[in-house]
């Protein structure tokens, strides 16, 4: 066994990524439909928008997103350290434990059991399970690095490792609650401190899970798929440390023009602006890795996913710092522009790099050279791309329109529009958003079929670890 890599747990998480992707995005499409046609709530409490939205966000971040990070980090750390995972049993525990977390979320959130904190809704017993699984994950990951046969720690592992450590810190500090019952707890913090800790957590969920984690994928799977070395290894190290040091400070930009002290808001804004540099450093490094291999984009849809994801990453990491500027935030905050920004990052960057990486993994986990159908991968790419563009464009227009309508005043100082008029004006954009989301979901369904056909009737191949020659 020690002569082989552990592909079993990688395959399990890869399948989970695809399945939960379909589920999480389906819930997203349902609530998008509810915003356009409210009757789809069916007057059933557990199908109401307020309960399904946290199910959607938890489903796509924790079920789809983190399952993808588990699969890729377990694969990359083995391949770059040339050693089997630290513990098969602990690795198996992280898989089943994480699925238990997801299933308990699917049960409790529609029942209305929530801590009421964005991305930290899950009640305290589930939060403790998350912490236990996460510690096991850290032991497996860092244990593998300690046992490595290659002296150098490849940069992708720095990103995965940074994400694992940061999430531990964030989850524990924001999870400090006083349980009242098994299903109800109260935050240890109150007022403005509670809000600040929540958005320190919330923004760094974006910064470390949805950014650092996926940059780990960029630095392994893009060079592998393109057959080219990383454009600048030095830049990869510099932008790793720059991201790590600046992201932690950016949280207050979620609380502009609130009761948060003004100096804290300004500090958050400054660090958000600084973040543009390391973010774009990473984006440029990834895209320049294609130097001399651009022709491959014509024939390789997996590479298309990866490169377009970097383009969306560049766009979202320009838009984010821009929206953190107070004057712009005064217009954008509380509008659907925020939703457009999130989904540029989530659908365009996180979704595409995950799909590209999983498409890279699946044939290797089935002992094949390619996916069952490359044409279907290409179809998925185009359907999803059109879906993302429709979604983001609709929400951008709606968001700016809402911001302008809310601040419009008559000469006598009264508001020009009632709130409900702005809601009515948004209706057509909600329909377009629903259409875009449906296309994106359709792409995910195509991926699920292709995954099934690729893995069907095939066992995990025995992947022998290369023997290093003693120098």
Where are these regions (language model features)?
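Alpha-helical transmembrane bundle and helix-membrane interface signal
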Residues: 148-149, 228
């Amino acid at each position: 066994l020690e002569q082989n890599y552990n592909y079993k747990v990688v395959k399990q998480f890869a399948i989970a990524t695809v399945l939960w992707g379909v589920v999480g995005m389906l819930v997203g499409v349902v609530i998008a439909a509810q915003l356009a046609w409210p009757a789809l709530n069916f007057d059933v409490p557990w199908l109401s928008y307020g309960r399904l939205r946290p199910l959607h966000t938890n489903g796509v971040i924790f079920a789809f997103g983190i399952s993808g990070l588990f699969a890729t980090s377990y694969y990359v750390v083995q391949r770059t350290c040339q050693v089997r995972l630290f513990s098969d049993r602990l690795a198996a525990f992280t898989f089943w434990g994480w699925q238990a977390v997801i299933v308990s979320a699917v049960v409790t959130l529609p029942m209305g059991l929530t801590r009421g904190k964005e991305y930290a809704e899950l009640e305290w017993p589930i939060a403790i399970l998350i912490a236990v699984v996460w510690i096991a994950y850290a032991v497996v990951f860092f244990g593998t690095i300690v046992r490595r046969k290659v002296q150098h720690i490849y940069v992708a592992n720095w990103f995965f490792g940074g994400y694992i450590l940061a999430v531990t810190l964030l989850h524990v500090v924001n999870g400090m609650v006083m349980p009242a019952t098994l299903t109800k707890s109260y935050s240890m913090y109150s007022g403005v401190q509670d809000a600040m800790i929540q958005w320190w957590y919330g923004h760094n969920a974006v910064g470390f899970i949805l950014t650092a984690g996926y940059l780990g994928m960029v630095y392994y799977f893009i060079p592998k798929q393109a057959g080219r070395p990383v454009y600048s290894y030095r830049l990869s190290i510099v932008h790793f440390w720059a991201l790590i040091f600046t992201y932690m400070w950016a949280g207050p930009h979620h609380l502009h023009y609130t009761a948060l002290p003004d100096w804290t808001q300004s500090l958050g804004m400054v660090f958000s602006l600084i973040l543009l540099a390391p973010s774009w450093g990473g984006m440029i490094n990834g895209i320049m890795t294609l130097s001399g291999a651009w022709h491959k984009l014509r024939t390789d849809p997996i590479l298309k996913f990866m490169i377009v994801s970097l383009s969306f990453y560049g766009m979202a990491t320009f838009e984010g710092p821009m929206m953190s500027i107070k004057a712009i935030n005064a217009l954008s905050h509380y509008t659907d522009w925020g939703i457009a920004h999130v989904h540029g990052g989530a659908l365009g960057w996180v979704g595409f790099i995950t799909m590209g990486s999983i498409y890279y993994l699946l044939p290797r986990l089935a002992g094949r050279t390619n996916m069952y159908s490359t044409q279907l991968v290409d179809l998925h790419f185009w359907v999803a791309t059109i879906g993302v563009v429709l979604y983001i464009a609709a929400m951008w227009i709606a968001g700016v329109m809402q911001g302008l309508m809310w601040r419009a005043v008559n000469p006598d100082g009264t508001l020009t529009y009632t709130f409900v008029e702005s809601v009515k004006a948004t209706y057509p954009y909600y329909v377009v958003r629903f259409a875009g989301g449906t296309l994106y979901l359709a792409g995910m369904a195509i991926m699920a079929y292709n995954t099934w056909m690729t893995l069907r009737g095939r066992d995990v191949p025995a992947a022998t670890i290369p023997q290093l020659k003693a120098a």
